[in-house]
């Protein structure tokens, strides 16, 4: 599964702690992140992370583009609800795309833990069907 990890500045430490705690689960998946968040996760866990631009420089939009192409399976986005963000429209668009494409989205550690446990149990395997793939990973003949 492809997992996006995003954290606002005030939530980066929390994201690093989360990624460290769940590194054994995350190691089985393809990780994507915005710039600094991805670097901090890589340094703390040693896990490979595909890094996009920083959020205010288009990173949220790059992840949003993957969602719109149905290439992202799970988004964990630790938002700071108490600080105004200059790229708030991008954040809203990202969250809207998760709703449009039925991509599970966690915006706090409580929900993130529920989703990561579900991922660990295989409860999110339905995402491969939504992506038009069979169990073996090849594309379905009915895919657009």
Curated annotation (Swiss-Prot):
Domain of life: Bacteria
Example GO biological process: methylglyoxal biosynthetic process
CDD domains listed in its UniProt record: MGS (cd01422)
Reactions mediated catalytically: dihydroxyacetone phosphate = methylglyoxal + phosphate
MGS-like domain span: 1-144
EC number: 4.2.3.3
Alphabetically ordered keywords of this record: Lyase
Active site, UniProt feature: 60
SUPFAM superfamilies: Methylglyoxal synthase-like
InterPro entries given in the database record: Methylgl_synth, Methylglyoxal_synth_AS, MGS-like_dom, MGS-like_dom_sf
Family matches, as Pfam families: MGS (PF02142)
GO molecular function, one term: methylglyoxal synthase activity
Binding site for substrate: 8, 12, 34-37, 54-55, 87
GO cellular component, one term: cytosol
Gene3D superfamilies: Methylglyoxal synthase-like domain
Function: Catalyzes the formation of methylglyoxal from dihydroxyacetone phosphate.
Family the entry assigns: Belongs to the methylglyoxal synthase family.
Protein name: Methylglyoxal synthase
Organism: Geobacillus kaustophilus (strain HTA426)
Source taxonomy: Bacteria, Bacillati, Bacillota, Bacilli, Bacillales
């Amino acid at each position: 599964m492809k997992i996006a990890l995003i954290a606002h500045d005030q939530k980066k430490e929390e994201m690093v702690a989360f990624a460290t705690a769940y590194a054994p689960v995350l190691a089985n998946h393809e990780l994507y992140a915005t710039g600094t968040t991805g670097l901090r996760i890589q340094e703390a866990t040693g896990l490979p992370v595909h890094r996009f631009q920083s959020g205010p420089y288009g990173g949220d939009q790059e992840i949003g583009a993957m969602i719109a192409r149905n290439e992202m399976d799970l988004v964990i986005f630790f938002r700071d609800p108490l600080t105004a963000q200059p790229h708030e429209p991008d954040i809203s668009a990202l969250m809207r795309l998760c709703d449009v494409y039925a991509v599970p989205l966690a915006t706090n550690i409580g929900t993130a833990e529920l989703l990561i446990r579900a991922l660990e149990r295989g409860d999110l395997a339905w995402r491969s069907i939504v992506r038009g793939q069979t169990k073996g990973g090849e594309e379905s003949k009915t895919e657009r």
